[in-house]
């Protein structure tokens, strides 16, 4: 977020000149923010409290990238080990997306449908990637090997539950989009889930890791 107050949603509302009756709020959850917003929006539509839900997200990697490069150039105490937590910062990209959700009954033309899903959480791994602001600006440090291992383990549990919930199997999806982290993550994930990597749709080679917008921007 560019600032603590007001909400980012208020700037979007003003720029688009939306109705005063429009409910606005920010929903933030690192790289899962857009997916969480889609589930919240879908629940509001199903409950009848909203007819149309506009989800907007933007990721600006420039500040983090610039601060990381500055620190790496200035901190002469860094060695081969202490520099590793900063590597992930150099893969960060920028992007923006907007998603409009509405009930399938309101759509006249064929559109992508949100069919369902499951939730799987491992908050014990929340220390493996931490970032924020300080007097030195925006910063982030990542234990990439441990985060990869924890993420693969969590994805295996999630995929097992998803297949049961949706009555899917490994051959059901025609296209597959994973979180856009990097090539090593991509290979290990497909191997762990026994999925066909030829169905993969990736953007990280061109856009980098675009965080919360990675999935929708790859669509």
Regions found by a protein language model. Name each.
Residues 49-69, 122-128, 183:
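Acyl-CoA/ACP chain-elongation machinery
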């Amino acid at each position: 977020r560019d600032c603590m107050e007001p909400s980012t949603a208020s700037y979007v509302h003003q720029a688009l000149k939306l109705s005063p009756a429009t409910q606005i709020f920010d929903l933030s959850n690192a790289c899962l923010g857009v997916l969480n917003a889609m589930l919240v929006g879908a629940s509001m539509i199903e409950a009848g409290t909203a007819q149309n839900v506009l989800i907007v997200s933007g990721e600006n990697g420039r500040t983090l990238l610039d601060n990381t490069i500055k620190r790496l150039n200035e901190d002469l105490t860094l060695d081969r080990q202490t520099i590793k937590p900063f590597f992930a910062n150099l893969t960060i990209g920028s992007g923006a997306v907007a998603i409009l959700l509405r009930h399938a009954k309101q759509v006249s033309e064929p559109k992508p449908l949100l069919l369902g899903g499951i939730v799987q959480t491992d908050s014990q791994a929340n220390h493996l990637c931490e970032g924020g602001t300080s007097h030195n600006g925006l910063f982030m440090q990542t234990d990439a090997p441990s985060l990869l291992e924890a993420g693969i383990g969590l994805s295996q549990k999630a995929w097992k539950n998803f297949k049961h919930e949706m009555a899917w199997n490994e051959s059901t999806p025609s296209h597959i989009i994973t979180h856009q982290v990097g090539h090593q993550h991509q290979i290990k994930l497909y191997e762990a889930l026994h999925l066909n990597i030829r169905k993969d749709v990736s953007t990280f080679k061109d856009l980098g890791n675009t965080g919360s917008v990675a999935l929708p921007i790859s669509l």
